[in-house]
Amino acid sequence: SIIIYKANTAMKYEKSKQVQYAVYNPDLMKISGDNQDYFVKKQIISAINNNNIFAVYQPIIDNKTQKVVKYESLIRINGVDNNTISPSSFLKLSKQCNLYNHLTKFMINEVFNKLLTTDIDISINISINDIMNLSTNNLITNKLKKMPQEKR
């Protein structure tokens, strides 16, 4: 969670400066990576806090028929100046910062909500770690249970 991330950031600062304690503030994030990492972390946190995460749906086309057979859901972040940030810029860092689960849960909720309003098939990219995460696993299970039988 964001609270754990902030606590870890303060703890890293405390250890690096060999002080008795540290109180979190956004400038402490600078110690945990270079300026680019710092900038991306700020954008991830801002996107989570301000609902600036969104899904795009990439068509999957059957090579024989040249028709769309389903869509793949892909996460994006609306960054500074409304620029779109692709996962290659933030997913690895989000895992290191304990923010990844927020992004995964967003995508699961987003895609299941989309499935309720459309007849198209949509895939979600999840890893074995996502499946093994109890909270994520429970979310997927609960969403599937609530999904009408014909939409599963």
What are these model-predicted stretches?
Residues 1-3, 18, 27-33, 60-65, ...:
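Catalytic strand-loop-helix junctions within cyclic-nucleotide turnover domains
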Residues 8, 88-92, 101:
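Conserved long alpha-helical elements within nucleotide-processing catalytic cores of c-di-GMP signaling
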Residues 5, 9, 39-42, 109, ...:
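Generic recognition of well-ordered alpha-helical segments
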